[in-house]
Design a protein with these regions (language model features):
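An N-terminal-biased, well-structured beta-alpha scaffold segment characteristic
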Residues: 1-104, 108
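Glycine-rich phosphate/diphosphate-binding loop of Rossmann-like nucleotide-binding domains
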Residues: 6-44, 154-245
Length: 293
């Protein structure tokens, strides 16, 4: 079997597979071809891949010589013409947002494996790319907010006086949100967390966060741990609660997403305008429409 690893386009720094994982496949008898410069932004040089046992080629030769092709993001629509019938593409496809791309891939006779719709089950845990990336996103979101904030997360006491700890509001207590809670608390901030799922309340508390909620949220045990669409009445109550807490917060980190749908708008324009001068908003749902209006 021949596996090809594509170089990502644009500002994407990730690569589908690092040299260490390539070496494992090589030992199993798999042939691996890596596109030139694929790992450059992930600090993996072409020589590192060669040392792992892979070969390095340009995109055209890689595609023509591979049966199974890996990438973080799917290749652009205008490049699908270089792929052949019977090939398999494995990527983070976001099927709900990329129906046109999927249709063109189908017409080319390609098999597409969407890593982002693997169910969140114990059996599939080792392939759960969304949770892995969400952990990193939650961590980096707090560090980015702390860097941008013209203040400090922890409380400082000195001869000149006392500086109160920053208040951080986290919207969504999924993997990214819970990671953000943990890091913000470790940095000394006071953390409040909003989520429509009451089941995450104890997890938030165990990390040192204060859980805030609106009564009447709709939940679905079959949703695999994800949030579900709420009623209009609930959304109005939700917006009132979020505005009340956001106005008093120094940092708001938004992580709420619904699989296969546009992210819910939780932070309205008037909420942003009512927030304190110098406060920071980090919207991790921006790629699916954003939680911030």
């Amino acid at each position: 079997m021949v596996i090809g690893i594509l170089k990502e386009s644009g500002a994407e720094r990730r690569v589908a597979m690092l040299p260490g994982e390539v070496a494992v496949l090589i030992k199993l008898g798999v042939t691996v071809i890596v596109e030139k410069g694929a790992g450059m932004l992930a600090w993996a040089s072409d020589n590192d891949y060669l040392a792992a046992g892979a070969s390095v080629a340009d995109r055209k030769d890689l595609v023509s010589g591979s049966a199974f092709i890996l990438s973080v993001n799917p290749p652009p629509e205008d490049e699908l013409q270089i792929f052949s019938e019977g090939q398999t593409l494995c990527s983070v496809v976001n099927p709900a947002e990329n129906r046109e791309w999927l249709e063109k891939a189908r017409l080319r006779g390609l098999t597409v494996l969407a890593l982002d719709i693997i169910p969140r089950t114990t059996r599939a845990q080792s392939m759960d790319i969304l949770s892995s990336m969400a952990t990193v996103s939650g961590y980096k979101a707090v560090l980015a907010a702390a860097s941008a904030l013209p203040g400090f997360f922890p409380m400082f006491m000195s001869a000149a006086g006392t500086i109160k700890p920053s208040k951080v509001l986290i919207l969504g207590a999924g993997v990214a949100g819970l990671q953000a809670v943990a890091i913000a608390r470790k940095l000394g901030a006071v953390v409040e967390v909003f989520d429509v799922r009451s089941a995450v309340k104890e997890e938030v508390k165990s990390l040192g966060g204060r859980f805030i909620e609106v009564d009447g949220a709709k939940e679905d045990s079959a949703a695999g741990g994800y949030a579900v669409e709420q009623t209009e009445e609930f959304k109005l109550k939700q917006q009132e609660l979020i505005q009340k807490h956001a106005r008093l917060s120094d940092v708001v980190i938004a992580t709420a997403q619904i699989p296969g749908r546009k992210a819910p708008v939780l932070i309205l324009k008037e909420t942003v305008q009512a927030m304190k001068s110098g406060s920071v908003i980090v919207d991790l749902a921006a790629c699916t429409g954003g939680n911030c209006e």
